[in-house]
Amino acid sequence: MRKPGNIYTRITNPTTAAIEGGVEALATASGMTAVTYTILALAHAGDHVVAASTIYGGTFNLLKEPLPRYGITTTFVDVDNLEEVEAAIKDNTKLVLIETLGNSLINIPDLEKLAEIAHKHQIPLVSDNTFAIPYLINVFSHGVDIAIHSATKFIGGHGTTIGGIIVDSGRFDWMASGKFPQFVDEGSSCHNLSYTRDVGAVAFIIAVRVQLLRDTGAALSPFNAFLLLQRLETSSLRVERHVQNAETIVDFLVNHPKVEKVNYPKLADSPYHALAEKYLPKDVGSIFTFHVKGGEEEARKVIDHLEIFSDLANAADAKSLVVHPATTTHGQLSEKDLEAAGVTPN
């Protein structure tokens, strides 16, 4: 801690890099590791999380099942309803967790208004920016304090490498908040280090690195870091082509007689069209969902008869992929939770 540097691969190595304009970033073994570390760094036993109901099924299940066993509870909210979001915040709430583009509703939260609510209550706004990626939006310019990525998706882009990234904007004032003594008070694990006093703006990410990453070890391997850094260089070009392909398919589906609905914020009739123009003027990405007329059987028939698309869940691959969220990415959710997430059998 006296001198920064690469002392051990599990903690840091020279083939990991910071992105997105934050003050510091931490690479992890997977996107779910990035989510888990972020939550565990902010919330401890007896604490509370407010989370969007329209998040990835794995994150939803983490918050609903294992974390309550460790004393961390969550209230899931409709992030379109700002009054509901604020009403859910308690004295022991430690973060508001959203996704820039929701998985699988592809909804866009009002980042600036949510940031205003979170900051009013002295807690950070955390956004999983996996589906949007920094090329399409800099979430920090809209009030987000911490960004999370599954680097497996658009950053990796080839379905061969698992990784995650946590990026700290460095803008949240942990000391002024009064709710995060773990970053302010002297701790015994690092010889009476106070993160806010001794490392300043990078207090959060350093705490994650020297506590959670060091002590639990879910580090990104140097080789995977090398692959992700290589592919990051072409991410803008790949995303542009992804978007072109997506728009062509969306146009086809919108006009298909057997399609009930298409969720894609760029569509003029999307409830998120105005937010897309505000927050994602460059483009809204290439992930979309659609509902066929009928039920799960009809949805399965569509998937089974596709020739170009592979039935795989690792979004943003170089291959064209399709998935049935209700039985895969969100398969562990109850019917009530699926409904809240906007995931239907069809």
Can you name each region flagged by the protein language model?
Residues M1-G21, L26:
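A glycine-/small-polar-enriched, mobile loop at the entrance of the PLP active site in fold-type I
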Residues Y8, I155, V322:
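Short clusters of hydrophobic/aromatic residues that line enzyme substrate/ligand-binding pockets
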Residues A25-H256, N263:
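Conserved PLP-enzyme active-site core in the AAT-like
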Residues K258-N346:
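Conserved C-terminal alpha-helix-loop-beta "cap" of PLP-dependent enzymes
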Residues P4-I7, G102, S150-A151, R209, ...:
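Glycine-rich, flexible loop/turn motifs
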